[in-house]
Amino acid sequence: MRAVPFHYILLVFIKDVLPARILGLFPHIGKSHQMAYDPLLRRLAERGHDVTAVTFFPLKNPPEHYRAVSLEGLTEIRVESINMSIYEGHNVFLRLTGLDRIRSHISENHPLADFALDTCSKLVSFKPLSELLKKEYDVILTENFNSDCMLGLANVYGQKAPIVYLSSCTAMYWALDRFGVTDNPSYVPLVSSIFTTPMTFLQRLENAVLNVYFKVWFRYAIQLREQKIIEEHFGRKILDLQEMAKNVSLMLVNAHHSLNGVRPLIPGIVEVGGMHLDKTRRPISQVSE
């Protein structure tokens, strides 16, 4: 008599496997960011999970279990526009002292506040989103970039599902503190800078100044103002967005230390560099001389 393999016996005791209900919240108007998350959303849906994505850029040819709530038309999508004046017109003194680079670095980040606040002011009254947030989910995925508005709205509607941050690049300067990670500017270059390790003394000095500046800027130019937008719309106080952010369960960053350098991380921040890549094999076209 042949023995019954153990895994066949184990199957008898396995209960039905249920798909997860996943809500994705992506309020940023940059298409390149959404392109980093789409392969993950597609794969989750292909594996049978119930995926609902709130985004400006719904999937084309979505799989069966994927549903999109489009934000298109809610605000202007600036897919191909950039203000080049922030890189022009610097005087000789700024160029000679290197202050022109600092000025440009600061200026190119400032529009992120306008994008975030404009979108947040419209999301608070966006009925399709409020209807979604009244339902129950197993996990909520949301982008961590220039806004905490979705975090606040999830709290307003009493969401209890664990929240997972997604980042299309190395974690932003203001994101690490909420996980208890110290990004020492003496050897951790800003994600948006041109610096690599090791840095010179002047580069470390510039890196430190901008690190402090951007954390303060995000707090006062975006986070507190988004909180005010939410509180004024719903007519009640909510928990500080910074405190809410400390309860996020996990952060997946589309980066890898082989390219971005070694950084101090914790188990709650996981590098998933290359998550945006299409693994489909395609023949390489012949190149003639």
Regions found by a protein language model. Give the residues of each.
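Conserved catalytic-core segment of nucleotide-activated headgroup transferases in glycan assembly
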Residues: A36-Y37, K246-N247, G261-E289
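Conserved nucleotide-sugar donor-interacting segment of glycosyltransferase catalytic cores
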Residues: L40, P111-M199, H257-L259
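Generic beta-sheet signal
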Residues: V54-F56, L71-L74, E143, V164-C169, ...
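Signal-peptide-cleavage-adjacent N-terminal segments of secreted and extracellular proteins
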Residues: I9-V92, K134-K135, L141, N155-Q159, ...
